[in-house]
Amino acid sequence: MAANYLHGVETIEKETGSRPVKVVKSAVIGLIGTAPIGPVNTPVQSLSDVDAAQFGPQLAGFTIPQALDAVYDYGSGTVIVINVLDPAVHKSNAANEPVTFDAATGRAKLAHPAAANLVLKNDSGGTTYAEGTDYAVDLINGVITRIKTGTIPPGATAAKATYDYADPTKVTAADIIGAVNAAGMRTGMKALKDTYNLYGYFSKILIAPAYCTQNSVSVELEAMAVQLGAIAYIDAPIGTTLAQALAGRGPAGTINFNTSSDRVRLCYPHVKVYDTATNAERLEPLSSRAAGLRARVDLDKGYWWSSSNQQLVGVTGVERPLSAMIDDPQSDVNMLNEQGITTVFSSYGSGLRLWGNRTAAWPTVTHMRNFENVRRTGDVINESLRYFSQQFVDAPIDQGLIDSLVESVNGFGRKLIGDGALLGFKAWFDPARNPKEELAAGHLLINYKYTVPPPLERLTYETEITSEYLLTLKGGN
């Protein structure tokens, strides 16, 4: 405000007109699971496979390293990782486990990786070997190496090992779901609520590989997706048949697919990937690969693109064969899509492709928001505008404020139309929806509407066999 009296010159800075809207991040995966090492019940930002290394190697039973490998097969991506395995709690003990050092390599392997508190004795138990003097140990992978200058005899020497090891079978659905502990700290998936204050964004794609097949976990993932404006990717259990997957959409089903939420994407079946540790194929949840693909499509094409009909990376096959023909409504993949289940299309020359555009809202909800890309585009628009509008909160309600808001929002819409994210957009101030009583209470309402381009899910050619072009025939000279 200007001074009452000034013998001189002053400048008063004013802010008027529209302001740009910052788009929120969409390609962020929230991963809840188990790792052999790494922070416990803490949301950790992972931006690459280098960051992923802090959660250890891919070991049987641990879900986080496998899921991170699936995501980073698509390149870089942002993953918020919550490891719920606490080695001080989720542990078992191996007592006097027989181990034998290989005569050629001088190495012995424990039956369980992610070990701790190792005590190694000779076969009779009379001599305790010293780490660093007699042997070196890789506790993560469970490999003991004989030191040549130590007291462990060379050759195929037998020994006995007693140790604790991180046991993922001790992790329960309650651990994955999480809670607020006595110290007021969130654990499990509930810690996803803390990420905005930590990193400035929320996860928009939620996965809990292996654990999401439990109905108790899947319903909590759905609830978290609603709170965060995200989509939860949920798998059917390993071994689920096609008939069981379809039946699971109803109340008589025996699996976790009975939902009509537009915050859930149902994934079936599991996929096969190559396991370097065993030199063989193993099954992996489709949700991990689908989440990595979704993030990649967001970055390469845009969040308004469907991730369906895109190549799955790192996948060698599917758990069970599914018939897939582009023109057969009775094919297995089409029947799954018809019931709102995302699957894998594998036909001659097609490769392995993610197949399915719709969330679990289909077929109950016929509004176009049952398309995942439509739902997610709406989420990005709505959240971006909410965060952008903070700068206007508590400003005086006047015509300048209303004009700035409407023009800013319309400018955002024009940008999205130019990007190809929208077909149309309009924001406006409606005096009839803003009575003086509401304005007097400090409440202002701005309307906006938009249209997201739906994916081309069904293409129909209408053809006619006609004789009319016979008239183009001409006689010779």
Curated annotation (Swiss-Prot):
Subcellular location: Virion; Host cytoplasm
Main location: virion
GO cellular component labels: host cell cytoplasm; virus tail, sheath
A GO biological process held by the record: symbiont genome ejection through host cell envelope, contractile tail mechanism
Keyword Manganese: no
Pfam families: Phage_sheath_1, Phage_sheath_1C
Gene3D superfamilies in the record: 3.40.50.11780
Keywords annotated in UniProt: Host cytoplasm, Viral contractile tail ejection system, Viral genome ejection through host cell envelope, Viral penetration into host cytoplasm, Viral tail protein, Viral tail sheath protein, Virion, Virus entry into host cell
Assembly and binders: Homomultimer.
Function: Polymerizes as an extended structure around the baseplate-tail tube complex. During ejection, the sheath shifts to a contracted form, thereby making the inner tail tube protrude through the host cell envelope.
Family assignment from sequence similarity: Belongs to the myoviridae tail sheath protein family.
Protein name: Tail sheath protein
